[in-house]
Amino acid sequence: PGPAMPEPTILDTIVARRKLDVAEAKLAKPAQALQAALAGAPTPIDFAERLRRDRPMAVIAEVKRASPSKGDIAPGMDAVAQGMRYASGGAAGISVLTEPTWFKGTLADLAGVRGAVESMGKTRPAVLRKDFIIDEYQVLEARVAGADSVLLIVASLDDETLAQLLDFSRELGMEPLVEVNNAEEMHRAIDSGAAIIGINNRDLRSFDVDLGTTDRLAGLASGGVLLAALSGISTRADVERFQAAGAGAVLVGESLMLADDPAAQIGELRGTHVSLSTTHDSAV
């Protein structure tokens, strides 16, 4: 026998399953049917512009029932109610997991959140489809469901597919969040022309978290790129650390899913939450 095949990573396993899911979805609803549904889909807002509006630091709050690393986080959670808690707390973006097997999310969750924030008008948070996207079909699905952006994970895409999905997303009016975890992926993301790059502190191969990842990689990006720090963020100190490293946004999932008052927690992360102990504001 030849050399042993490396064990598939968690990312490999999820992507392989997603490819099967997409093949099934195409049989149930061909791409032409989705294309036809585009006419009635809600108009996306500019994701980068919406994040920059909350300078110096935008919070993207994530709706996540479960994950491969933690198992169930909040399995019975109502995605729409949680999304509205995030919106009321001042989130610039709401990331909705739509992967069904490991994260227990659905496209219906995303459509529901998008419908609910519609009432806020132009100030509404942008809605991100958080998934393992490997096919234009999923980008179409996202747009029809009301997404303003989609996640593209560099580790799961070759350069050609990354470029193709970036272009296709932009044609549909969505600026993607392009996710990286190491220097090689960061260079690939920059070369692809990504405008919003998310540095994931969690390695999707092992699911280990290292908050130093953002510190190390942020300096590789050029000035025009909007950087977001993803994973492992739970305190105002974490946010300040990533802001100092050059990030303009943080994506926060698990700590908000577990918070008693997610809206207040977002205020705390943004530094806009006023508690009785912080009275220095009045001295300005």
Can you name each region flagged by the protein language model?
Residues 5-76:
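An N-cap/entry alpha-helix motif that binds or orients negatively charged groups
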Residues 14, 61, 86, 94, ...:
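Conserved, mostly hydrophobic/aromatic
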Residues 32-42, 68-74, 92-113, 201-205:
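Glycine-rich, proline-tolerant flexible connector loops at the mouths of alpha/beta enzymes
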Residues 54, 104-128, 154-155, 161-179, ...:
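Alpha-helix-loop-beta-strand connector modules within alpha/beta enzyme cores
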Residues 60-78, 125-134, 175-179, 228-233:
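Active-site mouth loops of central-metabolism enzymes
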Residues 90-91, 116-119, 144-150, 170-174, ...:
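Glycine-enriched alpha-helix->loop->beta-strand junction motifs that scaffold or abut catalytic
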Residues 96, 141-161, 198-207, 245-266:
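Glycine-rich phosphate-binding active-site loops on the catalytic face of alpha/beta enzymes
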Residues 134-145, 181-192, 229, 233-252, ...:
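Catalytic cores of alpha/beta
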